[in-house]
From Swiss-Prot:
This is D-aminoacyl-tRNA deacylase. Its EC number is 3.1.1.96. A motif (Gly-cisPro motif, important for rejection of L-amino acids) lies at residues 137-138. Transmembrane segments: none annotated. GO terms for molecular function: D-tyrosyl-tRNA(Tyr) deacylase activity; Gly-tRNA(Ala) deacylase activity; Ser(Gly)-tRNA(Ala) hydrolase activity; tRNA binding. A Gly-cisPro motif from one monomer fits into the active site of the other monomer to allow specific chiral rejection of L-amino acids. It comes from Clostridium beijerinckii (strain ATCC 51743 / NCIMB 8052). Keywords: Cytoplasm, Hydrolase, RNA-binding, tRNA-binding. It catalyses: glycyl-tRNA(Ala) + H2O = tRNA(Ala) + glycine + H(+); a D-aminoacyl-tRNA + H2O = a tRNA + a D-alpha-amino acid + H(+).
Length: 149
């Protein structure tokens, strides 16, 4: 599983012109699911996200986590995180999990995040979405449950 975690002052996602998810201070998270991801991968990424210490403390050091600040999370599914561009000019998405299995894991991931008692919003799996991200910093962290980064 891969995640692009962006610290935001706010973020929202629209489908067909309607806002379906919106947050204030927290993380905008783009999630990609691979063919070999398991529940353990979901837990690993969830724990990393909620415990990343990238929010400023009283000394202006990045020392606080999403849990510490009671931040919010907007999760967007994005299979293109598994685009392999090493050969040719068109990305190969063979490593991305497809269809129903990816949707099932995505929903399990959302359920896991919700156990953290933080506000969790999400996009619509498989939909064409418009995402507004007001980056704070910017701070962007790449996570990979297979530790490839």
């Amino acid at each position: 599983m891969r995640a692009v975690v962006q610290r935001v002052s706010s973020s929202s996602v629209c489908v067909d012109g309607d806002i379906i998810g919106e947050i204030g201070v927290g993380f905008n998270v783009l999630i990609g699911i691979s063919k070999d991801d398991t529940f353990e991968d979901l837990k690993y990424i969830k724990d990393k996200i909620i415990n990343l210490r990238v929010f400023h403390d009283e000394n202006d050091k990045m020392n606080l986590s999403l849990l510490d600040i009671k931040g919010e999370i907007l999760v967007i599914s994005q299979f293109t995180l598994y685009g392999d561009c090493r050969k040719g000019r068109r990305p190969n998405f063979m490593e991305a999990q497809g269809g129903e299995e990816a949707k099932k894991l995505y929903e399990e991931f959302l359920d896991l995040l919700k156990t953290s008692n933080l506000k969790v919003e999400c996009g619509e799996f498989g939909a064409d979405m418009k995402v507004k991200i007001n980056n704070d910093g910017p701070v962007t962290i790449l996570l990979d449950s297979k530790r490839n980064f």
